[in-house]
């Protein structure tokens, strides 16, 4: 489901960009209908395959990706999704932040690569929320969120690459965290 969720986010992100640039109206109603049908099928696959460890009550980066994917899809289909289902998704997103990150902001999976991926997922999830929802989550988790950013900054080496500690599957959604140039890092 994680891959499906990441694809859904990228589809919506790309669709938004292309829609703004579509002066010739290539993305017509027929395209939109097919796109929305395809996207809705993504939500069904994600919901039917949530990657949560119900036995041990743990959620990892896969479940966080599932929830972020659903948040993006539900935000796009806001009129077609029940208020209860959307709100539960927002609650699960905040719960994932608490379970995925220690109070210090470090990811519990003990991997700098997973920390980068999950921090990216949190950023992407926060972007799609309403300002009220986003502010509430940031206020409730300010220390964690600031800590996750600080730790990510510490994990970037002099060559602007992330220092490898723990597992690494090279996972990424949308590259929100751009590398700083070595010149800029030397100046700091």
What is each model feature region?
Residues 1-146:
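Aromatic-lined, polymer-binding surfaces characteristic
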Residues 110-119, 123-188:
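Extended polysaccharide-engagement surfaces of secreted carbohydrate-active enzymes
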């Amino acid at each position: 489901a994680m891959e499906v969720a990441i694809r859904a986010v990228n589809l919506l992100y790309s669709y938004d960009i292309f829609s703004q640039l579509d002066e010739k109206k290539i993305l017509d109603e027929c395209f939109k209908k097919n796109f929305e049908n395809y996207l809705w099928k993504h939500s069904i696959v994600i919901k039917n395959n949530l990657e949560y460890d119900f036995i041990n009550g743990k959620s990892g980066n896969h479940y966080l990706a599932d929830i972020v994917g659903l948040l993006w899809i539900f935000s796009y289909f806001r009129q077609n999704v029940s208020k209860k289902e959307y709100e539960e998704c927002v609650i699960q997103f905040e719960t994932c932040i608490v379970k995925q990150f220690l109070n210090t902001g470090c990811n519990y999976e003990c991997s700098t690569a997973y920390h980068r991926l999950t921090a990216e997922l949190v950023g992407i999830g926060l972007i799609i929320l309403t300002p009220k929802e986003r502010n509430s989550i940031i206020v409730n988790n300010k220390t964690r969120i600031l800590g996750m950013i600080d730790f990510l900054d510490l994990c970037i080496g002099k060559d602007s690459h992330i220092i490898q500690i723990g597992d690494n599957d090279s996972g990424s959604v949308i590259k929100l965290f751009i590398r700083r140039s070595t010149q800029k890092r030397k100046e700091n």
